[in-house]
Every structure is written in C-alpha cells, then in structure tokens.
Regions:
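Short, small-residue-biased leader/transition segments that mark boundaries at the very start
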Residues: 1-8, 304
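Radical SAM enzyme core and accessory elements
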Residues: 9, 15, 286-302
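Short, structured beta-strand/loop micro-motifs enriched in basic residues and often containing a Trp
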Residues: 13-21, 41-44
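Terminal peptide-recognition signature
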Residues: 25, 33, 61, 105
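Conserved PDZ fold ligand-binding element
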Residues: 27-45
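PDZ-domain C-terminal substructure recognizer with occasional recognition of PDZ-binding tails
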Residues: 51-87
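Conserved Radical SAM active-site core
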Residues: 70, 77-223, 233-262
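Flexible glycine/acidic-rich beta-alpha junction loops that bind and position SAM and/or redox cofactors
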Residues: 204, 224-250, 270-294
Length: 304
C-alpha cells in the first residue's frame, strides 16, 4: 500500500457505502466513506467498467480515504473475485429514463400520491444486465452496444412488443422504435444472450401480428433464448390514455394454442420451447398451468 498524490482530470468518483465482512476490501482497510477513483489507472464510467476491470488476477486500485489521503493498492486475487463493497449508487452512474410513451405503460396507470421513485420510468440496458429489467433499445446508442458486446454482458432482456417496425413506433409512441429493432441484429451477431417480452394488446399486436413477430423472433434463437407473452395490465387510472381492451376467455385460448404450436416447432428445431404464455392466460382460459419442464428453467423470470 502506498500513499499517492495523483490528479486525473475529469475523473469519476464512486463513494463506497458499505464494506462486506471478510472481503478483499476489508482486508485492505477500505472503509465506508472512502472513494474509489480508478482501477489500473483507468477511470470507471459505470458498473460495467467496474466489473470488467475487476475481472483480473492483478488489479491496482486508487482509493481516496476520508481524511483526503490517496492510497494506491495492488491486489492479487482470484480472477472472478470482487472487491466486496457496495457503492452509494449501485449503477455507478445516472439512471437512464425511458424516452417512450407506450400506449400500455403501467406507470402511467398508477394512482397518485405514491412514493416518487415508483413513477420513474427506466430504460437502461445496465439495469437489464444487473436486475433483469426489460429494455426497449430505443435509447441504446452504438457506444452502448459496443460495450455490451465487448464486455459480453448477458443476458439482455428486451421488450419487443412487435417486430413490425411501423406498429412498434405506434405502440411505443416513438418514431425511432422501429429502427431500434436493428440493434437486435448486432446483439445476435455479438452472441449476447437475450430474453424477450411481448406485452399483448387486444386488436393491436395479437393474433396475426403476433404470428409475424414470433416468426421473426424465432430467427434469433437460440441466442434469443425465450420470449414471454403477457397480457396488457389495465387499471382504473386511465383517464386520457390510449383506449385498450381486456382479453377474454376466447382470446386466451387462441393465444395459448398459438404459443403451444410455436413451442412444438421450436422444440423440434432448437430443443427449447422458446415462447411462453404467462400464467394469466391459463387462468383466464380456465386451463391448468403447464408442467415445469415446459418453461426451460424459467429463463423469462426476473432474478434480483
């Protein structure tokens, strides 16, 4: 351990909130309130950078202590071992908000008077990797794609809604939403594992439109390893919002037959069921839920 005076122009600082007992950080006498300045003389843009730079057997950390001293710490560790700290901001950067105005958005349908954080609409690929959030790709830049492919951050969970570009623009109320589908090609070619989701809206992206979407999405299997289909959720707080209808039993049974037909195709072709109807469809149809083996290990579930 060496004290070091160092000036990095425009360096990003990351405040350490907690040090885990028995961790590398505790052994190095890193404490809550210390600040991580760099790893291997590289500034850390966000949690992607942090994880990528920490994946090595030898790393050099620059830490600023609470008293203002800067410590340069040379660490020898197992390749996959983490430092063992929690940062004040888990993303180590600002959260990216959603640029869409989806006709089915559940946040727009929430009652007033709840805590402020519940009304924040995120659409951040980093949260997709870290927490399983679904992203629309509309605010994902080429730089973001390059980093995801470079760091091989998998899986990325994508909200497709439809593979019809014009319809996707309408559903997301974003004129770039159709063009954003081209980013799926880059993720696929970069061998980035994906899961997909379709929020089904009656008379909009169901039936024939869904058939078209599943046909297009099946071309990305098995890199795209699952597509979950969920019915749009409608609340009583819909004043001024796009008029949407609830599905009925007949709709649910049609959807399930459509899904099961595609499952047979995909099992034969790739050995996975690929497309999954959420529990709501089976309950609405009056059917028993499928056996566990049909879910391919529950790839579509969000694990936090």
């Amino acid at each position: 351990r060496r004290q070091r005076q160092m000036c990095i122009r425009d360096r990003v600082e990351h405040l350490i909130k907690e040090v885990y007992p028995g961790s590398i950080a505790e052994e190095l006498e890193i404490e809550p309130g210390d600040v991580l300045l760099s790893i291997n003389d590289q500034s850390i843009e966000d949690v992607f950078d942090y994880r990528y730079l920490m994946n090595d057997e030898f790393v050099t950390l620059l830490i600023r202590k609470k008293n203002g001293e800067e410590w340069e710490l040379e660490v020898e560790k197992e390749y996959e071992d983490d430092l063992g700290v929690e940062f004040e901001n888990s993303l180590m950067d600002e959260y990216r908000s959603c640029s869409n105005h989806c006709i089915f958005c559940f946040i727009d349908q929430m009652p007033p008077g709840m805590r402020e954080t519940l009304y924040f609409k995120d659409d951040d690929s980093r949260l997709s990797f870290l927490q399983g959030n679904y992203v629309t790709l509309t605010n994902m830049s080429d730089y973001d794609l390059d980093r995801i492919i470079k760091f091989h951050l998998s899986p990325i969970n994508v909200s497709f809604q439809t593979m019809n570009p014009k319809l996707r623009c309408k559903m997301l109320h974003n004129r770039f939403a159709g063009d954003a589908l081209a980013k799926v090609d880059r993720l696929y070619k970069g061998d980035v594992t994906m899961n997909g989701q379709i929020v089904l809206c009656k008379g909009i992206n169901d039936r024939d439109e869904l058939e078209y979407s599943l046909e297009k999405l099946s071309e990305y299997a098995p890199v795209l390893q699952s597509v979950s289909i969920v019915p749009v959720g409608l609340s009583r707080y819909r004043k001024g919002l796009y008029p949407l209808e609830s599905f009925d039993k007949e709709d649910a049974r049609y959807l399930i037959s459509q899904v099961e037909r595609w499952q047979k195709i995909m099992v034969k072709k790739h050995g996975i069921h690929f497309v999954h109807a959420s529990d709501e469809w089976y309950i609405l149809a009056g059917y028993e839920l499928p056996e566990e083996g049909r879910y391919d290990g529950y790839l579509s579930l969000i694990h936090i």
